[in-house]
Amino acid sequence: MIWEPVLAKFKELFGDEGEIGVYFAPGRVNMIGEHTDYNGGHEFPCALTIGTYGVARKRDDKKLRFYSMNFENLGVLESSVEGLKPEKEADWTNYPKGVMWAFGEKGMKVESGMDLVLFGNIPNGSGLSSSASVEVLTGFILRDMFGFDVTNQDLALIGQYSENKFNGVNCGIMDQFAIAMGKAGHAIFLDTATLKYEYAPIKLENAKIVISCSNKKRGLGDSKYNERRSECETALAELQKVVKINALGDLTEAQFEQYQDAITSPVCRKRAKHAVYENQRTIKAVEALQNNDVALFGKLMNDSHVSLRDDYEVTGIELDTLVEEAWKIDGVIGSRMTGAGFGGCTVSIVKDDAVDAFIEKVGTAYKNKISYAADFYVVEIGDGPVKLA
């Protein structure tokens, strides 16, 4: 079992007495519907069978002792449940501490500390939501440990709240929602404006989902993410002078074409066009899957990437290379960047008999062009957070 070394590390660092729990929260990938979550549109993410493992034990004092097997050079990072605030030297522990703080803000005070060891098999900085996975995992552990009366959907909202207010990153709800609400074999058709959702089975006969990781490091906080949000807000404010909408996601393509001249900046107009068209693509993509039309789903994935490249301008040479090389290969049904962009990953649907050639050819072309290697993961769609032991 993947978690056994994590439990062994916990016992080595913190001893084996008391009630020790073993937990898992997945990572996520978004199949289509990118940069729509803060524009009141739809998304189509799913939880993965890779994610974050946590071993935790409640303490009878206020002390927090955190250790990550992914950042062993940092050693055990100690703090307290009293006076929680973000600190640069706290590094990755700002994510679990932020969730503890957020529980307190929502009227559920974490009264005692804990010992925690984490191990993630999500590639770090890949855009598969390692931070949101840690947030949902922390919330799930706190619920189990302290008996807080919260649903999995609440855990998603608390995770997002902590990332926004404690860590100062303007993320939407998708990452935490997909992780907290994951269901094996299904993606989540999520209306980000209302949080209404439905599960849609992903039936890929003779095909696999392949994640290609660019290995270009990026952080949400220092990317152009916030800039894109404000460009969309500017476009929305100008559109609202001529048409009654709450969000860009309220518009159809035809309505956008009718009213787009209200947006004075050509750049903001392009950003808004992506938000509107991507939302409509996502709705069509889910319909395509329901009709078992995987080929149409793949075409919409490809169109999504073109829009993210040309109208939203969040791809960059690394992601474009991965996708454009994928498009050349027989047996690739669809390929696009996924996540915030500027590095991170692509998601591709690849026929079973083409997977090996895909990894070899895309990998070689990428290394030749970018000068360092990409990593490839053939992934399965998994469930949300779980207590393993």
Regions found by a protein language model. Name each.
Residues A132-S133, C345-I349:
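FabD-like malonyl-/acyl-CoA
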Residues G33-H35, A47-L48:
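N-terminal cofactor/phosphate-binding cores enriched in small/glycine residues
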Residues P45-A47, V55-K58, G107-M108:
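Short, charge-rich binding segments
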Residues G51-Y53, G113:
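Extracellular structured ligand-interaction cores
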